[in-house]
């Protein structure tokens, strides 16, 4: 893994990405399925939760903003409830601006997904694919082009990126010296000639080239065929799902990148995350190979999340900093990030455990407790007292190690899946937020005296008291060191 990758996300701040494409509203309806309809052989979903978010080109822009940069979104909406919802979401999104062309006669594109557990049961599309007002779209694009560092064309074949609009946008960007990243939908890849990089998935590449991707060699052939279609195109990055990605750069040998996702929960919007990361990496001065590597990591992160989600700069930096660059190595999270990770674990039916402590000078007693805690669950969260919290509990000479050092040591253990810092005297708020299936403390406590035991037992969880290793304590260690 390129050592420079971990530093790239820090360079995203201050960059502006101009996104032109098909904006849509993504709605997710979650529920339980426990019976078949008596009216027809179809499952009945008992709706539990509904969410809505920016989709399509809007999700590219949302990912840009989440990565710490500024996104300017150019798209097309109708004068309807879905269009109004999209405009409201854009206004509420930090780091995101938009120039939306409104067509009163048009329906705003909307995708509704019905999800139960880890399965998408049904998708309902409401859309108008007729060509939009190309002149108005290009006028908005050209107005914002000068302030952009890079351009993304996000094509979902919903009427925005007609051949004329694509040609006008690429020509204007080239004249202004702006790189162009294309997420294509048309089978005619020649229309994207002059772009910096095109990012088809395996299906789109096969439809455009006639080469079905069955191996690395076939993917190399497809990449070469794409470059032959568009002489002015610099590179093609074919995303291949579980097989990873293949990067074909003109006059360079192809590069194969293995998939990085450890667990795949939802691929919705993953291509948008990849496109946003590619664009920002290129804007930050990365080579196309580096940009592809970073985008590959981002794609692996986002498919492990629920619904159309985003990747943050902090998550990407942590992932790129790990030895293998694997999403599973991201173990230190803030409360909000941890909440999303836990939701994903729970949606996959994993048993979540929780323990907590200061873990100032890690010793065999700590290691034993953590090993026992992990044995009682599938994923273990460690709530870690911040420096201020430790000082309040243990006195002004503690902690010996600062919180970041303590978190890093804990995160290096195979028994620990997630470390979350907390400032409070007790981890009660974390326990209420994460609702662990198993709460673990040392056997020097009783079940009744474990903080949060009443909460966990109240919703049917379990409290485990781990056996202690005699004579092991941080206080004793410090005393021996000072004697």
Swiss-Prot record:
Region (Cytidylyltransferase): 354-483
EC number: 2.7.1.167, 2.7.7.70
Gene: hldE
Gene3D superfamilies: 3.40.1190.20, HUPs
Protein's recorded name: Bifunctional protein HldE
Active site residues per record: 272
NCBIfam families per record: cyt_tran_rel (TIGR00125), rfaE_dom_I (TIGR02198), rfaE_dom_II (TIGR02199)
Organism this protein belongs to: Caulobacter vibrioides (strain ATCC 19089 / CIP 103742 / CB 15) (Caulobacter crescentus)
Binding site for ATP: 201-204
GO-annotated biological processes: ADP-L-glycero-beta-D-manno-heptose biosynthetic process
